[in-house]
């Protein structure tokens, strides 16, 4: 076996990199210095691992070696075929071979190469580090092991390489505080102390705080708040993706995992944390191979390996419950989603950390709004994660505003720029008529420039005060961490000096500056550093597209006027609108069931009386846009097989990936009015589907995803019993009796029983028709105004249109046709013939029982 065959894979890779470096630098020979630079460039290599444990500026060392390489002679033509290893490099490899034999290794490892040739690198390393200290560190990384395989030196310090030490992070105060979850942490410690099967697995939905519970354990270990058995333990999070990454050959992943397990067994004080533990099932498996789960099983069963797993309930069912041998080795701990109050406690605990990070103040009202609004409007995620995200994003938005120029100052600067341009244009024209305007511009510019100077001075002053407050906060945070460190090391004198002398001194200064800042805020400051509930509502609005004001208290006052607002669009249906308004008011007052839709209504009545228009008006009023109306024509679902289109096709059928027409629409617009038009035309099985929505406020689509209907208003329209409603001779009691009879024939009792209101729309009378003509004409008026033409319609003309377009059986729809014929067609002709121009007025009046336009 020659020298090169005795090299480990990692040393071979280092040599290949050294050759590539020599080619890049156009050097004729590969030297030990090229080898050193190649090792410094390998972030996963043993040299970098050793240097990271020492107080060394690695980047400065790299630059020093780079400058040494630049001194080497360059040749014009060099290729991989004619490049040579110089004598010094071959000698260095032989030196490493000698050390290999002394150590009892079977292959030349990278650390052996470094240790055998430290004298070659001393001149370049000495200014940056103690070479004896480096030798000691390299020896400690070996931990007395011998290299018996080509791949063995890749797995030295496997745990360091593929894991993140959470206890070390807790020691350095790099973990967020963990609030609550005491019960779960105690149960986890209980399981870890067991003799066998001492492996807890945390189960819970994404975002409920599984990883935080493990971080809480790491913090308790550091603070010595754990039983004696766990006192000196290290919690190391295993990075599975890093373990799999770069495993080129079959069995390499398994080899790495085995080394990690061996290291954990030998150290005896490591608790391995595997997040997303379901990924170990099948990881690394190939034909005839063994997956990671099977490698872990024996060690887990014997209690040699302390492991904490974390996964979701869905993944646990999918992977663990199928593999009973793996399942019985873990003890499940279920983490439920915290309540709003528990989430609020967590947010209050994280408040200081977030304030320090973003350099702002977070009001308690913002924390309350975050917990409540996220629970109410962001239904596809879980507390506390979604509430923390809201606070974090709101704080980031505020920080951006703080670091940008204030809007008021920017506006003044833009105004100055605009006036300067106008001034230059007037100077170029040099007309006498421009003199007055020029004087006005000069006066405005003078005032604006003065205002700009004042605003800039105010901005600078506020910035200085804020910077000083931020600096003091950072210093106090640093002092608190220092005091914690002294306490842990038992130096209580130093800790007391910090807590009772240095921190109070800083707090006093900070209070004075805070008082100054508050005075600035009261006097109309340019900078706002406090996160409020309005900021949180704004972020929720960006996420969900729900208008901001809908989430705030001011909306309740607006809802009081809902009836009059709806009557502006829907005429002659006072009774129906009153019933709708009452249901909406109940919801806004918080008296309706929060697990059901905001309201569910069945609108009955003949065609053209305002059923669909009421739904549109409601969408406009509640959500500021008709676009928040999800309209589904139920006549498309007459056949039984078509019903599946509402929730999505079953697996294996065409359209499965597309989702359901109803469920997808509500998922995209969770805050909307859902209108199921002409519902009696649909197949009867549709109503079975709607029972779940009306009762529980959610519907499960074909993919098993739960779609929330709690923020929707469900309106079903129907022409059932329209005959009874059109009968003039029938009394109100007889009409109601006929309606009930018709409903019983068409709908099942369990469906009718779940509706909030069954609302009857009456046939329209002549007075209502005239009002509708007015509303329809307003739309024509708006279109004409866009062209700069003002049009009017007198009362007699309205009556004539109402008379021509009214039909008791067809409702208000024929009115549109009458308006087209009697007004719009005539107006269109005048525009196309250029008889009317912009800023003209046209009055439509009655002459000889006909509507004629009069141009003014």
Swiss-Prot record:
Residues 764-856 are annotated as: C-terminal. It is found in: Cytoplasm. Residues 338-545 are annotated as: Linker. Residues 555-763 are annotated as: NBD2. Residues 85-144 are annotated as: Repeat 2. Keywords: ATP-binding, Chaperone, Coiled coil, Cytoplasm, Nucleotide-binding, Repeat, Stress response. GO terms for biological process: cellular response to heat. This is Chaperone protein ClpB. Pfam families: AAA (PF00004), AAA_2 (PF07724), AAA_lid_9 (PF17871), Clp_N (PF02861), ClpB_D2-small (PF10431). Part of a stress-induced multi-chaperone system, it is involved in the recovery of the cell from heat-induced damage, in cooperation with DnaK, DnaJ and GrpE. Acts before DnaK, in the processing of protein aggregates. Protein binding stimulates the ATPase activity; ATP hydrolysis unfolds the denatured protein aggregates, which probably helps expose new hydrophobic binding sites on the surface of ClpB-bound aggregates, contributing to the solubilization and refolding of denatured protein aggregates by DnaK. The gene is clpB. One of its GO terms (cellular component) is cytoplasm. InterPro entries: AAA+_ATPase, ATPase_AAA_core, Clp_ATPase_C, Clp_N_dom_sf, Clp_R_dom, ClpA/B, ClpA/B_CS1, ClpA/B_CS2. GO terms for molecular function: ATP binding; ATP hydrolysis activity. Signal peptide: none annotated. Residues 388-522 form a coiled coil. ATP 1 binds at residues 204-211. Residues 7-72 are annotated as: Repeat 1. CDD domains: AAA, RecA-like_ClpB_Hsp104-like.
